[in-house]
From Swiss-Prot:
Pfam families: Vesiculo_matrix. InterPro entries: Vesiculo_matrix. It comes from Bovine ephemeral fever virus (strain BB7721) (BEFV). One of its GO terms (molecular function) is structural constituent of virion. It comes from the Viruses. Plays a major role in assembly and budding of virion. Completely covers the ribonucleoprotein coil and keep it in condensed bullet-shaped form. Inhibits viral transcription and stimulates replication. It is found in: Virion membrane; Host endomembrane system. The keyword DNA damage does not apply. This is Matrix protein. Residues 14-23 have a biased composition (Basic and acidic residues). Residues 1-10 have a biased composition (Basic residues).
């Protein structure tokens, strides 16, 4: 498992190593060394007057592995593959922000792993870190620990893809990095990752600011 905040060049090849034509357009992501400043401000004028956020820490252990018969060259392609979770998620509704944001954080920062098997393209990453999540009270689990494991099958370019995701979160008294800092780690080419707010909407999770300027998660009300 690779650490979320590991400095230096991680082991294993990246997509950039094999296909330089994607370096300036949309490369598969690799771990950066520092988060960029938040430049995009998300507002929800209808609700932010009522939003009360609190921040809690969790010891998060999460790992994601994707195995595809065809290479997945672009971040947008990987996100399309991972999007199968939208329909297949069957974990906690209230704590979905913790589980899914960790899933997307790793998913946008996967590493291509070396493989000696033909037509077997493996991508993996994960972390064990104390992570802080900010949001409304309902996103924070009442239980001391929550776990979620999921195995999914989907396709890419007409060929099968398997996805294996393991997540556990345990309440911690320690301070840690905010999950938004983790998600916003710069890409291998120095650019920013895709807009997390847009990715979360399909999961009925909102990322917004309240009147105090706090940036946090809320669960969208089902219509």
């Amino acid at each position: 498992m690779l650490t979320l905040f590991k400095k230096g060049k991680p082991k294993g090849g990246s997509v950039d190593d094999r296909n330089s034509s994607y370096r300036e357009s949309d490369p598969m992501l690799v771990w950066g060394t520092a988060p960029p400043a938040y430049l995009d401000v998300y507002h929800d004028e209808r609700d932010k007057n009522e939003l009360q956020f609190n921040t809690k820490s969790y010891l998060i252990q999460a790992n994601l592995e994707v195995i595809s018969s065809k290479p997945i060259e672009r971040t947008t392609e990987m996100l399309k593959v991972l999007d199968v979770m939208v329909d297949e998620y069957d974990g906690s509704y209230l704590s979905k922000a913790l589980i899914i944001t960790s899933y997307l954080t790793i998913g946008t920062h996967l590493r291509r792993m070396m493989s000696s098997v033909k037509n077997n393209h493996k991508y993996n990453n994960g972390f064990t870190e104390v992570i802080e999540f900010t949001g409304t009270a309902e996103i924070h689990p009442r239980d001391q620990e929550i776990k979620y494991n999921k195995y999914l099958m989907t396709s890419h370019m007409g060929e099968p893809v398997s996805i294996s995701y393991q997540f556990s979160g345990k309440k911690s008294k320690r301070r840690g990095k905010n999950i938004l800092d983790a998600y916003n780690l710069e890409l291998g080419n120095g650019s920013k990752p895709p807009d997390l707010k847009d990715l979360l909407e399909s999961y009925e999770i909102n990322l917004c600011y309240n009147l105090k300027g706090e940036h946090g998660f809320t669960n969208l009300v089902k219509s």
